[in-house]
């Protein structure tokens, strides 16, 4: 919010759970980029639905009622795809609703809601599916990873050669602006990554090196990690734990699965050519954490 103030951006504050505030925000809005969500890998499903699905529904109603909308961009996630190894998966593969945590399941449901509005209400919308979004001001994954790297608590799952699905925030913003500038993208879905294959080992090594931390030296066999994840999740749910176990399904997906997704469509239809490589983006990201005293 402070950054928006520095840029002189006019703000209309509200909540996705407060329809009246959404009506105020939607008044006169011709272009809308919806990137708000409850993010996490643990917690009651209804808490995710209240924001990611019902909140989205209230926002759609508000922008449609305003009557001036020209383009709505819904930021989804590559997490909507089935929780398995992926090798070049593209947008022709349907999202999955099985074996999902609350966040990814509600991202699937949110996409379904947007698509229904496209069909039934003629909503002028485009869906963008980024991978793991990283960059300066990250408040979700990297802060936790940096803490564990500093404490020497990170282990590879298997060989660590499984691929990541990184998306630098600046590259994502480029795609969003390109989508908004091209009405022909209405009704389309786009996978978005850096297009720069990086393994789990390469990712973690780069973060650790830039931060000045020791590289992880040990690994957990993939089968063992999967088994421990299943047991940990079941036990934590049985005990009603409020925090995710160290090994959750979402974390296993992040560290254990091969997450290679095709971005051929966004390259072809938008001429997308990522400006920032993974190493450039992560260097800028860790520099920001260092400047903020967060290392």
Language-model region placement:
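Conserved Rossmann-fold NAD(P)-dependent oxidoreductase catalytic core, especially the SDR/UDP-sugar
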Residues: 58-102
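NAD(P)H-binding glycine-rich loop region in Rossmannoid oxidoreductase-like domains
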Residues: 3-5, 9-54
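Catalytic helix-loop patch of NAD(P)-dependent Rossmann-fold dehydrogenases
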Residues: 85-133, 154
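Conserved C-terminal active-site "lid" loop/helix of NAD(P)H-dependent oxidoreductases
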Residues: 169, 205, 228-238, 242-273
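A conserved pocket-lining segment of Rossmann-fold NAD(P)-dependent short-chain dehydrogenase/reductase
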Residues: 94-97, 127, 147-167, 171, ...
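Amphipathic terminal alpha-helices
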Residues: 261-269, 273, 277-295
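Glycine/proline-rich active-site loop of Rossmann-fold NAD(P)-dependent oxidoreductases
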Residues: 108, 121-123, 134-144, 170, ...
